[in-house]
Amino acid sequence: MAEQLYATLKTNRGDIEIRLLPNHAPKTVRNFVELATGQREWVNPETGEKSTDRLYDGTVFHRVISGFMIQGGDPLGNGTGGPGYKFADEFHPELGFTQPYLLAMANAGPGTNGSQFFLTVSPTAWLTGKHTIFGEVSGEAGRKVVDAIAATPTNPRTDRPLEDVVIESVVVETR
């Protein structure tokens, strides 16, 4: 069996193991892995300074919508931040939002991917062709963590959790 690439989001609510899909979205997976491991330079939106810090460590899931998705990856933690660059979408004909627990890029329209991502908690077919899918939650334990985060009480105006859900670190490994 061929080796697979995994990213584990270690959160204050438990671990979410994700099987990444580099054969379907190679640029997106590379961007995510390099930001997660400190191998890609990014610009801190708060200071304007270049950084090779691990972007996702210490960030929060800033937007949580029960029955839909959980969103994170913003270095500012409010939905407005990113890495200081944007890149194109990668849509693969074999991938659509026909099942829950998919990892995809959040964006503000075509070609605006950066660092923000979301995990779905239900099929969301209307997102197919609008957001790059680049992974899927690989096990029942991680799916339960995603579901628990999605059920977190939020501010009804902003969809932000009332208590921070923190991505403490991201571990990337091939196995």
From Swiss-Prot:
Q: Which InterPro entries match?
A: Cyclophilin-like_dom_sf (IPR029000), Cyclophilin-type_PPIase (IPR024936), Cyclophilin-type_PPIase_CS (IPR020892), Cyclophilin-type_PPIase_dom (IPR002130), Cyclophilin_A-like (IPR044666)
Where does the UniProt annotation locate this protein?
A: Cytoplasm
Any Gene Ontology CC annotation: cytoplasm
An example GO biological process term is: protein folding
Q: Which residues form the PPIase cyclophilin-type domain?
A: 3-172
SUPFAM superfamilies cross-referenced by the UniProt entry: Cyclophilin-like (SSF50891)
Q: Tell me the superkingdom of the source.
A: Bacteria
Keyword Cell cycle assigned to the entry: answer is no
Activity regulation summary: Inhibited by cyclosporin A (CsA).
Record keywords: Cytoplasm, Isomerase, Rotamase
Known Pfam families for this protein?
Answer: Pro_isomerase
What family does this chain come from, according to its entry? Belongs to the cyclophilin-type PPIase family.
What is the purpose of this protein? PPIases accelerate the folding of proteins. It catalyzes the cis-trans isomerization of proline imidic peptide bonds in oligopeptides.
Name this protein carries in UniProt: Peptidyl-prolyl cis-trans isomerase B
Organism equals: Streptomyces anulatus
Quote the gene name from the UniProt entry: cypB
